[in-house]
Regions:
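Residues at the starts of beta-strands that form the adenosine-phosphate
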Residues: 9, 32-34, 118, 145, ...
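Internal alpha-helical scaffold of NAD(P)-dependent oxidoreductase catalytic cores
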Residues: 39, 140-226
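N-terminal Rossmann-like NAD(P) cofactor-binding module of classical short-chain dehydrogenase/reductase
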Residues: 66-67, 92
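Rossmann-like NAD(P)(H) cofactor-binding subdomain of soluble oxidoreductases
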Residues: 78-134
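A conserved regulatory-domain signal marking ACT and ACT-like small-molecule sensing domains
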Residues: 283-367
Length: 367
């Protein structure tokens, strides 16, 4: 089997956001997909969306690949069942933790070593704050990392199949062992979720008048706090050992910050605050840029637009006709006014040109 060309049929067990998105993407690639979920409602929604057909237990269906897209608590058991039910199929899972799953499978006396060889863990680094099949998108994984996590007994055929799924879904393939993967996602995914949730929880008793002043800074840092608590309880529990040292490091920094703020004008306090902020600057600068490229600084052009249909589309059309590429875009609505502020990021060398073009077209550019 060539990499990037998956042979069906495929069975997707778990028709939530990830499972249904994978099914939609594979169906778009012309692959036959069967669906199975403990929730009849979730199954029906996925079928109605065109993700595949129902493939309940006992049907005459022999998939070459089974994708397990279920919460971490039940994933090992469902993998074991799939390995037993489909003895010729490769089985992969999409859970965001890997070490606890492979450990549970190895400890399961009912899972033979030969069967376990057909299993490979996968973790698509894509998602949304919304959950469930109705939030699924066939292009969800496009250009996102697809982490393949084989264990020492995984066959080369199983690993190649796991890679092919990601490639057929438009993802970028990365291979890691379970420990490296779990440490990485603890830092870049699970810890940010905790930080966002803790920050958002501070807003529970905040006066409405204070929240009315909120801008994109607060919205950006609390966006993922809207994620499903039921799923995250499981994720955090399964990756607790990797999270503890990160949280202990944060605790140390918070203790240091509190000590400084208790006497902010003492000798050395300003330097300590500057060091904390600078460390944050340096860490943020290490985050890769677009398409995995090295970090790059962009210039920002701010434009006031009326809160009317088509305004942003017209703005971007004017940019395109001028031959200026937009690197990123943010929009902030003005409280109490029917206008918004669009912040467009462009290459620094194109900033003045863009300001001139937009001003000439009567856009309200904030200088």
């Amino acid at each position: 089997m060539a990499e990037g060309y998956l042979q069906g049929p495929v069975l997707v067990i778990g028709t939530g956001l990830l499972g249904t998105s994978a099914a939609l993407g594979l169906r778009a690639a012309g692959i036959e997909v069967g669906l199975r979920d403990a929730s009849p409602t979730a199954q029906r929604i996925a079928v109605d969306m065109g993700a595949g057909f129902l493939a309940p237990h006992g049907t005459d269906f022999a998939p070459s690949l089974v994708i397990v897209a279920t919460p971490p608590d039940v994933t090992p058991g469902i993998i074991a069942q799939a390995l037993a039910e489909f003895p010729d199929a490769v089985v992969i899972d999409l859970a965001s933790v890997k070490g606890s799953i492979i450990d549970a499978l190895k400890a399961d006396d009912d899972v033979a070593e030969a069967d376990l060889a057909r299993y490979v863990g996968c973790h698509p680094m894509a998602g949304r704050e919304k959950s469930g099949p109705a939030a699924a998108r066939g292009a969800l994984f496009t250009a996102s990392p697809w982490v393949v996590v084989p264990h020492e007994g995984s066959t080369s055929h199983a690993v190649k199949t796991a890679k092919s799924v990601g490639l057929d879904l438009g993802a970028s393939i990365t291979v890691m062992d379970a420990e490296t993967h779990d440490a990485a996602v603890a830092l870049i995914s699970h810890f940010p979720q905790i930080a966002s949730s803790l920050l958002a929880s501070r807003l529970l008793n905040a006066p409405a008048s204070s929240l009315a002043l909120a801008g994109n800074g607060l919205r950006d840092t609390t966006r993922i706090a809207a994620s499903d608590p039921r799923l995250w309880i499981q994720i955090l529990a399964h990756n607790a050992q990797q999270l503890i040292p990160i949280l202990e490091g944060l605790q140390s920094d918070l203790d240091r910050l509190l000590a400084t703020l208790r006497d902010p004008f003492a000798s050395g306090a300003a330097l300590d605050l500057a060091e904390l902020m600078t460390e944050g600057n340096q860490g943020q600068a290490r985050i890769p840029g677009k398409h995995g490229a090295p970090p790059q600084s962009f210039a920002t052009v701010s434009v006031i637009v009326n809160d009317e249909p088509g305004q942003v589309a017209r703005l971007l059309t004017d940019m395109g006709e001028a031959g200026i590429n937009m690197e990123d875009l943010r929009m902030e609505h003005s409280s109490g006014y029917e206008v918004g502020l669009v912040e467009i990021q462009v290459l620094p060398g194109r900033r003045d040109e863009l300001v001139s073009v937009l001003t000439g077209l009567d856009w309200k550019v904030v200088q």
